[in-house]
């Protein structure tokens, strides 16, 4: 795959699972002879939800919940066919969303 890069975007709610998956992808790519740029930590998306504590009265009493989405970006430069095969066979954690662009 001459002159082509693979861009991988990873998303997860837990940053520890995300970092472990990133390390696994980087080690697999380096083992097959490709060079890796990254991982680049992208901004964390924080969604906040505010709900009433009581179902009936007390509008002033509220509770806030938040959901954090952590993201990482990897570029694999000049991947070999072995790199692509190894990445396809890679089994990542269940809570990680992977987007791949060629």
From Swiss-Prot:
Annotated PROSITE patterns: RIBOSOMAL_S10
Biological processes per GO annotation: translation
GO cellular component: ribonucleoprotein complex; ribosome
Similarity comment: family membership: Belongs to the universal ribosomal protein uS10 family.
Name of the protein this chain belongs to: Small ribosomal subunit protein uS10
Subunit organization: Part of the 30S ribosomal subunit.
InterPro entries: Ribosomal_uS10 (IPR001848), Ribosomal_uS10_CS (IPR018268), Ribosomal_uS10_dom (IPR027486), Ribosomal_uS10_dom_sf (IPR036838)
Molecular functions per Gene Ontology: structural constituent of ribosome; tRNA binding
Encoding gene per record: rpsJ
Domain of life assignment: Bacteria
Entry-linked SUPFAM superfamilies: Ribosomal protein S10 (SSF54999)
Keywords: Ribonucleoprotein, Ribosomal protein
UniProt keyword annotation of Ribosomal protein present: yes
Task of the protein: Involved in the binding of tRNA to the ribosomes.
HAMAP family: Ribosomal_uS10 (MF_00508)
């Amino acid at each position: 795959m001459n002159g082509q890069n693979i861009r991988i975007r990873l998303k997860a709610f837990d940053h520890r699972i995300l970092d472990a998956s990133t390390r696994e992808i980087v080690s697999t790519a380096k083992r097959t002879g490709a060079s890796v740029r990254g991982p680049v930590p992208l901004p964390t998306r924080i969604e906040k939800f505010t709900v009433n504590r009581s179902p009936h009265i007390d509008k002033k009493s509220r509770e806030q919940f938040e959901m954090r989405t952590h993201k990482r970006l990897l570029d694999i430069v000049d991947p070999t066919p072995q790199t692509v095969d190894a990445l396809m066979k890679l089994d990542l954690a269940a809570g990680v969303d992977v987007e791949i662009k060629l």
